[in-house]
Amino acid sequence: MVIKKLDVVTQVCPFPLIEAKAALAEMVSGDELVIEFDCTQATEAIPQWAAEEGHAITDYQQIGDAAWSITVQKA
């Protein structure tokens, strides 16, 4: 299993989701993508996209006043 970190802090929506989709597309099943972001819309958009695609959210936490980290495991 590979764990890749994607730092999209300061990027506005929808770019965190676009970059997450591109990064996960290059990964294999079971790999994890740790996405750090500060776009409030992505707090809903990324988990919704992951669920629709069948990927698992293995970790989701707030890191600071207005930033989050979410880990998506590729299906």
From Swiss-Prot:
This is Putative sulfur carrier protein TsuB. Belongs to the sulfur carrier protein TusA family. Pfam families: TusA. Disruption phenotype: The tsuB-cysA double deletion mutant cannot grow with thiosulfate as sole sulfur source. PANTHER family: SULFUR CARRIER PROTEIN YEDF-RELATED (PTHR33279:SF6). PROSITE patterns: UPF0033. Gene3D superfamilies: TusA-like domain. The active site is at 13 (cysteine persulfide intermediate). Induction: Member of the CysB regulon. mRNA levels are increased by disruption of the rppH gene, which encodes a RNA pyrophosphohydrolase. It comes from the Bacteria. It comes from Escherichia coli (strain K12). Involved in thiosulfate metabolism.
